[in-house]
């Protein structure tokens, strides 16, 4: 049984608005240490805003973001930088640098953020590329030479090379064909299992839920309105959950 001691991330009464548009409206959520948690919901409900608030990329209006028992939403300077080292994020678009080789993209944080020598950083980058199913030769290519799915793999390698405690994924299968999406979903699960870390994924894709999730939360009207295990989601009598699942099935 999970206890409070197992909680890695606590979100308490989060509020975020843009003008009169309310995005997060008293959101509460616990994410346990080393679990794979997936937030689902249709496009436009605020999933990406939630991620950015968790990282401090957007300020919250009020509420608390607690990681490892410490309040983080008001951290500044060195304390904030230390907190951010716990996280790595794979953005929806991959956000690779076109002017750099693939290995340079993967090693960017090591070289620029930690001062790791380029020779060692390249070796570590190639190791991480191999971990996500790519070979050393790919490391010498540029992002525009790779498919969308391969770019997603590179983004995964760039995230895990930083050895985060918490790995965040923003709509990991967006824009991908079903075969490639399945490969990326399997890769996310592999990263979670092999690295034994906490993963937090936001998606509108039920195939991601089925492959990746230990537990699932449904975001609607600015709150997590339902949460449970993968087995429980199919049995849920929550109207919004069933409506979302039905729409996904229909679209597939």
Where are the regions that the model predicts?
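Helix N-cap at the start of a conserved alpha-helix in ABC-type nucleotide-binding domains
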Residues: 178-180
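Conserved ABC ATPase signature
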Residues: 142-146, 150
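Conserved ABC ATPase "signature" region
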Residues: 71, 119-137
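Catalytic Walker B motif of ABC-type/P-loop ATPase nucleotide-binding domains
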Residues: 167-170
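Helix-to-loop junction immediately C-terminal to a conserved catalytic motif
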Residues: 55
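Conserved catalytic motifs of ABC-family nucleotide-binding domains
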Residues: 163
């Amino acid at each position: 049984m999970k206890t409070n001691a197992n909680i890695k991330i606590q979100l308490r009464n989060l509020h975020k608005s843009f003008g009169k548009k309310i995005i997060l409206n008293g959101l509460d959520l616990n994410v346990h240490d080393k679990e794979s948690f997936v937030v689902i919901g249709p496009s436009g409900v605020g999933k990406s805003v939630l991620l950015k608030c968790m990282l401090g990329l957007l300020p919250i209006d009020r509420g608390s973001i607690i990681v490892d028992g410490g309040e983080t939403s008001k951290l500044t300077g060195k304390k904030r930088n230390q907190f951010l080292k716990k996280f790595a994020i794979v953005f929806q678009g991959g956000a690779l640098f076109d002017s750099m080789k693939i290995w340079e993209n993967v090693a960017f944080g090591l070289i620029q953020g930690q001062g790791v020598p380029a020779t060692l950083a390249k070796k570590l980058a190639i190791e991480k590329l191999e971990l996500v199913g790519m070979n050393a030769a790919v490391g010498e290519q540029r992002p525009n030479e790779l498919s969308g799915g391969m770019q997603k793999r590179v983004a995964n390698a760039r995230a895990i090379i930083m050895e985060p405690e918490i790995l965040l994924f923003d709509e990991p299968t967006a824009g991908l064909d079903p075969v490639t999406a399945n490969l990326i979903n399997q890769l996310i699960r592999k990263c979670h299992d092999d690295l034994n870390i906490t993963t937090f994924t936001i998606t509108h894709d039920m195939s991601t839920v089925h492959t990746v999730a230990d537990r699932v939360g449904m975001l609607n009207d600015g709150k997590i309105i339902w949460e449970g295990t993968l087995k429980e989601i199919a049995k849920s009598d929550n109207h919004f959950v069933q409506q979302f699942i039905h729409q996904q099935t229909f679209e597939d």
